[in-house]
Design a protein with these regions (language model features):
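Terminal low-complexity/charged segments
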Residues: 1-169
Length: 169
């Protein structure tokens, strides 16, 4: 491997250098790179439509998968974080864009309702800071290692999270 072909900091070859299979589009190449890098924790790789892909990642590898997406696969912009409240779990949904590859990935991680904790990705994308605080404030999801995890919209002494389905206001 030449000096210019070295692996990225997380050990994955960048999308432009990742070996492609005949006829494989960039979205499928990203999904394959994630699945190969995190074989036990990344699943459900799907191309939703041209330029939009989706994958699920176990919360234990969320931070590492996000670093891989940014540093090795060129996903430079976290466009949004959202949370979905299901009966027994939360899904945290990340929309992450690669403008160079013209791709958007919807990365989904799940956490049980009785342990709503995932790693913060604010050190990967600075824009995650306020979005994680909003999810904490309104849904009660805790983002480990967040630099300032506190309420952003509601008063600091409020004891509830108003967008949770179990909230009775």
């Amino acid at each position: 491997m030449s000096e210019g072909d070295k692996l990225g900091s997380t050990g994955v070859v960048g999308i432009e250098k990742a070996p492609s299979r005949i006829g494989e589009n960039p979205g499928r190449r990203v999904l394959r790179a994630l699945a190969e890098s995190f074989p036990k924790t990344v699943s459900g790789g799907t191309q939703l439509r041209p330029g939009v892909i989706r994958a699920k990642v176990d919360r234990s590898d969320l931070y590492s998968a996000c670093r891989t997406l940014k540093e090795d696969l060129g996903f430079e912009h976290l466009t949004m974080i959202s949370a979905v409240d299901y009966e027994d779990r939360f899904e945290i949904v990340y929309h992450i864009a690669s403008y160079q590859s013209r791709l958007l990935i919807e990365l989904i991680s799940t956490t049980p309702k009785d342990d709503p904790v995932v790693d913060s990705v604010s050190s990967v994308w600075g824009g995650a800071n306020w979005q994680e605080r909003e999810s904490y404030d309104l849904m009660g999801i805790v983002f480990k290692s967040h630099p300032k995890l506190e309420r952003i919209l509601l008063p600091k002494d409020v004891l509830y999270h108003p967008l949770r389905k179990d909230f009775r206001g």
